[in-house]
């Protein structure tokens, strides 16, 4: 079985900064003697995680794979600019091309708790749609929160995760 992993820096581990040692996902893979494919990238949005996971499973065999996905914070976005995807989050902008700096500044000013709750509700549905897609592909999977749960989405209003989401 292949352990497919995606998420933000929590799923990537110390390697994001050129560190040494093993991430927790590497420990999981080692413990169960599994090969691993880790598509995690620091500061990833749910959009990037879903996009790259679907690309991976569309272009590679899904036979005998298990997906482990860690979700970051809900305000994060992915912007496509000149055929390059950029991870966007509050306070993280130095990697952006100059032509995106003004857009980023406007975006950052709009980020408050009410916008976070709104995005949390949107992402809740996007992640559930991805969960259903993985089920259609017959790919077993587990999702977990790296940062926090779905803010503003009451437990009784959350969709049925079929025991695939640890929140």
Where are these regions (language model features)?
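Alpha-helical cap/lid subdomain in secreted, periplasmic
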Residues: 54-167
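Short, glycine/acidic-rich beta->alpha junctions
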Residues: 20, 49, 122, 126
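Serine-esterase "nucleophile elbow" of acetyl-processing enzymes
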Residues: 1-48
